[in-house]
């Protein structure tokens, strides 16, 4: 049995059409991930599927490929009626708990469907509804939406209906039911056809998810691609116990040890992300914040700059810890230990994705020790300590203190908590005119320590 499990089938061997196999190859998907290998055969047969999979497991492909294959068969393999192919508009709908995740899912659909003229629309809050109405007027094959905005259009947009829907996807269903979407979700389910295929994907199987499963799936096949709370084997996890007053020094030390790496740093509050990003910028690091306080356009702008390499450090709250498809994240640093240990799993899930290696480092102060102990209990392992030269760390104290002082003054001058919708001028100045500043200010450290990258 173990030998059978070790055999990795190709997408073609799983029954995926040649057009989509080529699309997978273009995306660098050489072989199916575990969730794809287990879910695709059933999904391609037309069965309802429940997939329990961790972040970064490739679950988007597990539902996008069957939908696109069914769309191809519906258009090209069905008998034409009165000389015309059936209209495949509003063929599938994917519901997502966040705007960012919806946009990422749509991007993957468009990449996979590039050769088949796929039409895809995104319906999320924070984006002009008139633009979305125009997109719906083009009769997209696939809609990716948050439940609230989708229901707004179903209620108010003239001529829009999902009566012809063939596929429904509930992605990150545990979060869909935990973020005040339950009412909108129930309204949507009452309006769409009962005769449809449904895919439900979730990180955990909660009571609410089970209830949703019973309500909207028919004889589903359950695929569990990971243990309930686990981290991938390619993730190197470490911690460092530090006094609270020295935590910033340790953070700067760690970032200086790996200057070319892409990093995500998690803080507990929105103000904390902005303050820490300001501190790091003043020390020459290319950091940018993202949090729920920012407008949608600013959040997407920050993500795009991070993806494009204009900055290599993203300072974020847990709003960014799930669902963001950011490639090549090398390091995740828990600057603030999460009070909910399950959030740790989602945070470190930003690295070591799709078979790549990655590092997760937690900075634990004396007030966070109990939370950290709960994390180790959850993942079932004791983590090794991140080795650091204490003398080198403490030598940063004066520079870090000065940077914190300047950043606090900057925050105070701009009114502390930025008003929602206000431009992040510091980000624009930093990214627009000081791209080389980090390397210049840290020049000595870069040559000295870049060779140590990931040896820890």
From Swiss-Prot:
GO function terms (MF aspect): ATP binding; ATP hydrolysis activity; RNA binding; RNA helicase activity
Class of this enzyme: hydrolase
Chain spans, region Disordered: 407-456
Residues annotated for ATP binding in this entry: 53-60
Reported phenotype of the disruption mutant: Plants are indistinguishable from that of wild-type at 16 degrees Celsius, however they generate a weak phenotype of pointed leaves at 22 degrees Celsius which become narrower at 26 degrees Celsius. In the leaves of plants grown at 26 degrees Celsius, the xylems are located on the adaxial sides and the phloems are on the abaxial sides, similar to those in the wild type. Plants with double mutations in this protein and in AS2 or AS1 protein have abaxialized filamentous and trumpet-like leaves with loss of the adaxial domain at high temperatures.
Catalytic activity, reaction form: ATP + H2O = ADP + phosphate + H(+)
Location of this chain's protein in the cell: Nucleus; Nucleus, Nucleolus
Keyword ATP-binding in record: yes
InterPro entries in UniProt: DDX47/Rrp3_DEADc, DEAD/DEAH_box_helicase_dom, DEAD_box_RNA_helicase, Helicase_ATP-bd, Helicase_C-like, P-loop_NTPase, RNA-helicase_DEAD-box_CS, RNA_helicase_DEAD_Q_motif
Pfam families: DEAD, Helicase_C
Motif (DEAD box): 171-174
Residue ranges of every copy of the Helicase ATP-binding domain listed in the record: 40-223
Keywords: ATP-binding, Helicase, Hydrolase, Nucleotide-binding, Nucleus, Repressor, RNA-binding, rRNA processing, Stress response
Expression sites (tissue/organ): Expressed in all tissues and organs examined including root, cotyledon, first and second leaves, third and fourth leaves, fifth and sixth leaves, shoot apex, flower, flower bud, cauline leaf and rosette leaves.
Listed CDD domains: DEADc_DDX47, SF2_C_DEAD
Positions of the Helicase C-terminal domain: 250-394
Known role: Involved in leaf polarity establishment by functioning cooperatively with AS2 to repress abaxial genes ARF3, ARF4, KAN1, KAN2, YAB1 and YAB5, and the knox homeobox genes KNAT1, KNAT2, KNAT6, and STM to promote adaxial development in leaf primordia at shoot apical meristems at high temperatures. Involved in the processing of pre-rRNA intermediates at high temperatures.
Domain notes: The Q motif is unique to and characteristic of the DEAD box family of RNA helicases and controls ATP binding and hydrolysis.
Family classification: Belongs to the DEAD box helicase family. DDX47/RRP3 subfamily.
UniProt-recorded name of the protein: DEAD-box ATP-dependent RNA helicase 10
Gene this protein is translated from: RH10
């Amino acid at each position: 049995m173990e030998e059978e499990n070790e055999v990795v089938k190709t997408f073609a061997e799983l029954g995926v059409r040649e057009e989509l196999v080529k699309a997978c190859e273009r995306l660098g998907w050489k072989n199916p991930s575990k969730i794809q290998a287990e879910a695709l055969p059933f999904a391609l047969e037309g069965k309802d599927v429940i997939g329990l999979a961790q972040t970064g497991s490739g679950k988007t492909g597990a539902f996008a490929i069957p939908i696109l294959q069914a769309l191809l068969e519906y258009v090209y393999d069905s008998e034409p009626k009165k000389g015309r192919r059936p209209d495949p508009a509003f063929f599938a709908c994917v519901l997502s708990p966040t705007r960012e995740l919806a946009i990422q899912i749509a991007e993957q659909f468009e990449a996979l469907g590039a050769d088949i003229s796929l039409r895809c629309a995104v319906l999320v809050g924070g984006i002009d509804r008139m633009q979305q109405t125009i997109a719906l007027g083009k009769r997209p094959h696939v809609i990716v939406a948050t439940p609230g905005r989708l229901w707004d259009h179903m209620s108010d947009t003239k001529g829009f209906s999902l009566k012809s829907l063939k596929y429904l996807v509930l992605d990150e269903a545990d979060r869909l039911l935990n973020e005040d979407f339950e009412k909108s979700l129930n309204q949507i389910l009452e309006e769409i056809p009962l005769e449809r295929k449904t895919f439900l994907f979730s990180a955990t199987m909660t009571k609410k998810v089970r209830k949703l499963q019973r309500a909207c799936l028919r004889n589903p096949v359950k695929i569990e691609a990971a243990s309930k709370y686990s981290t991938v084997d390619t993730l190197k996890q470490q911690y460092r116990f530090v006094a609270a007053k020295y935590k910033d020094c340790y953070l700067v030390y760690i970032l200086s040890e790996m200057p070319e790496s892409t990093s995500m740093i998690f803080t507990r509050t929105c103000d904390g992300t902005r303050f820490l990003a300001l501190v790091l910028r003043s020390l020459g690091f290319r950091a940018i914040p993202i949090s729920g306080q920012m407008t949608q356009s600013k959040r997407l702008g920050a993500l795009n700059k991070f993806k494009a390499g204009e900055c290599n450090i993203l300072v974020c709250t847990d709003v960014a810890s799930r669902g963001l498809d950011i490639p090549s994240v090398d390091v995740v640093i828990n600057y603030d230990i999460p009070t909910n240990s399950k959030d740790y799993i989602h945070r470190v899930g930003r690295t070591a994705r799709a078979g790549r290696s990655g590092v997760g480092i937690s900075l634990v102060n004396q007030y966070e020790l109990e939370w950290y102990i709960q994390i180790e209990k959850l993942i079932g392992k004791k983590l090794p300590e991140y080795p650091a030269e204490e003398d080198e760390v403490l030598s940063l104290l004066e520079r870090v203190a000065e940077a914190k002082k300047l950043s606090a003054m900057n925050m105070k001058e701009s009114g502390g908590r930025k008003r929602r919708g206000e431009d992040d001028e510091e980000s624009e100045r930093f990214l627009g005119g000081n791209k080389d500043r980090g390397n210049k200010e840290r020049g000595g450290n870069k040559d000295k320590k870049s060779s140590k990258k990931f040896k820890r």
